[in-house]
UniProtKB/Swiss-Prot annotation:
One of its GO terms (molecular function) is nucleotide binding. It comes from the Bacteria. Keywords: Nucleotide-binding. This is Nucleotide-binding protein NATL1_05371. GO terms for cellular component: cytosol. Nucleotide-binding protein.
């Protein structure tokens, strides 16, 4: 029996599922009658999406479809950070959607402090863009998971628990 147990708290999403959701989005935009002539383009980069179209209303429709497709593919909606809609040349508008991945130092510190203040039998250590929680008892780790899950809504970030050891 191990002397201590641990798990990692991370904020990640499945990149392939996101690509699949974007492909479905493009297909639906091409086929829908109200969006067919909108010249809408959706580009995906490593950490952001860009949506270019003729009007704000079209971008809002595309945004709704994106959220619907992401939900069907089990992607958390908290990974999307929608920026302000900007006007670009040629009567076009663009919206950048930042993709949230990894725990920031600020959020890691908040979670670490939360665990240290509320649970004396477990330790939290920041490891890059993840947080490792270690304890001698599995029940204490379960309590730490429940404590962090309660805080997840307030932090507005999607959290996952990995590497249970």
């Amino acid at each position: 029996m191990p002397s201590s147990y641990s798990f990692d708290v991370v904020s990640e999403f499945d990149q392939q599922e996101l690509v699949n959701a974007i492909d479905q989005l493009r297909r639906e935009v091409d086929q829908r009658y109200d969006l067919k002539d909108s010249k809408t383009k959706i580009d995906i980069k490593e950490d952001e999406l860009s949506i270019v179209s003729l009007s704000d209303m079209t971008i809002e429709s595309v945004k709704d479809i994106l959220l619907q497709k992401a939900t069907k593919r089990n992607l958390s909606l908290k990974i999307f950070d929608f920026q302000k809609i900007e006007t670009i040349g040629g009567n076009m508008v663009m919206q950048i959607v930042k993709l949230k991945k990894g725990l920031s130092q600020e959020i890691s510190k908040k979670l670490s402090k939360l665990v240290r203040d509320n649970m004396k039998k477990v330790t939290a250590s920041i490891q890059g863009d993840s947080l490792r929680i270690t304890g001698k008892n599995k029940d204490d780790l379960q309590a730490a998971i429940n404590l962090i899950k309660k805080q997840e809504e307030e932090l507005d970030i999607a959290l996952q628990f990995q590497n249970y050891r």
